[in-house]
Amino acid sequence: MLKMETVDKVDMIKNHGLTASENLEKFLKRIEAKNDDINAFLEVRGEEAIKRAEEIDARIASGKETGKLAGLVIGVKSNINVEDFNVSAASKTLENYTGSYDATVIRRIKEEDGIIIGMTNMDEFAAGSSTETSFFGPTDNPAAPGRIPGGSSGGSAAAVAAGMCDLALGSDTGGSIRNPASHCGVMGFKPTYGAVSRQGLLDLAMSFDQIGPLAADVSGISLALDVISGYDPADPTTLDSSPDLEVERELKGLRVGVVREFLEVTDEAIDEVIQGKLGAMEDEGAEIVELDFGYIDLCLPTYYLINYVEFFSATRKYDGRKYGHRIEDVCGSEVLRRIHMGSYISQKELSGKYYKRALQARSLIRREITGLLSHVDIIAGPTVPKLPHTLGEELEPMEMYAYDVLTVIANLAGIPAASIPAGDVGGVPVGLQLQAKPGDDGMIVSAMREIASL
């Protein structure tokens, strides 16, 4: 059952070939057997999920309409509000905070009969790339045991990779969906900025953050995007129209940009896997177009300067007065460092020296990457330039940040991007990143569908 295409499973549930309760039961057993070792889920609400599945089954049995996600089991990153669930952001700051409402994406999932099974682990307040900074302990990588699953949505990626749910939601600020998708050998999608409502998300950096799905197959990504995308009056950053996910393009004639600088910063073993996948695409008729990107060295400093300032602003509400603890009193070292850096940069006398220059650099990067995309249909390359390290291995901050060098570009530019499995290096998964013009989310989904069949 776990290998069944997600869209086929929905059809099977709707047509009496499988009940929502049976689907849920297998995932609950899987979670019970595996989660103590993997630590993908921080909270599982089995009883509520069982009631929800029974309601869906009763409606199907009586011939009533059911939604696009009927009976699918979904995990949710712990920084997205779900009513009556623990929304901790994997921090002691909010360890006992219970969501009082559903985020827009959760409401839409429930309206389409998706079943929320629980909250997944993550880096504390999404500030990390390994899911090791969680107050509740690290998450293991089911696809490469003993290594990090990536982050910050590592629990969501691990849950999908371990077969604990059909779909999972993550948030992506600088690669936090795509990075763990790559490391765990699953698919992850960061939508165009504004395509999906952020209402109900605990922000890391509001001008970068996007909620998106992780899944084991392309149909799961497409189904989830179809449900969660669209204008939301509660989030003024959302776009008026949803992306067209019905795009169908064969690889034959598809213009695929390959950026030389992206490959130059990538480990040789990963590069070989990526080149193999690009070669397979070319064999199917894709046109490979070599491109140059002149601002690769600007991307990480630009991203982190803006990230620090926006994160500092976002964390001022965690003062311990209304709920939880004062963040500076209980948070981990990475969160505290980002707060201190954001405070320093935000000081009036320094804003022109760092933050304003970072905004100018962001404009340069956005113009450069969108300019390159005007010549091709998609840009393809490695998602992450190096393999995931061993759990517990000590890395300097800049070594950790290096995981993000190829993923932050999409967040700086607001463009859609995804990671799809490309192969492995010694059994460790490697992801192929696809990027497209703003609003061309459907082009990426179409390309993912074609690449997955190679």
Swiss-Prot record:
InterPro entries: Amidase (IPR000120), Amidase_CS (IPR020556), Amidase_dom (IPR023631), AS_sf (IPR036928), GatA (IPR004412). It catalyses: L-glutamyl-tRNA(Gln) + L-glutamine + ATP + H2O = L-glutaminyl-tRNA(Gln) + L-glutamate + ADP + phosphate + H(+). One of its GO terms (molecular function) is ATP binding. The active site is at K77 (charge relay system), S152 (charge relay system), S176 (acyl-ester intermediate). Pfam families: Amidase. GO terms for cellular component: glutamyl-tRNA(Gln) amidotransferase complex. Its EC number is 6.3.5.7. One of its GO terms (biological process) is translation. The keyword ATP-binding applies. The keyword Protein biosynthesis applies. Keywords: ATP-binding, Ligase, Nucleotide-binding, Protein biosynthesis. Heterotrimer of A, B and C subunits. Allows the formation of correctly charged Gln-tRNA(Gln) through the transamidation of misacylated Glu-tRNA(Gln) in organisms which lack glutaminyl-tRNA synthetase. The reaction takes place in the presence of glutamine and ATP through an activated gamma-phospho-Glu-tRNA(Gln). NCBIfam families: gatA. Belongs to the amidase family. GatA subfamily. This is Glutamyl-tRNA(Gln) amidotransferase subunit A. It comes from Methanothermobacter thermautotrophicus (strain ATCC 29096 / DSM 1053 / JCM 10044 / NBRC 100330 / Delta H). The gene is gatA.
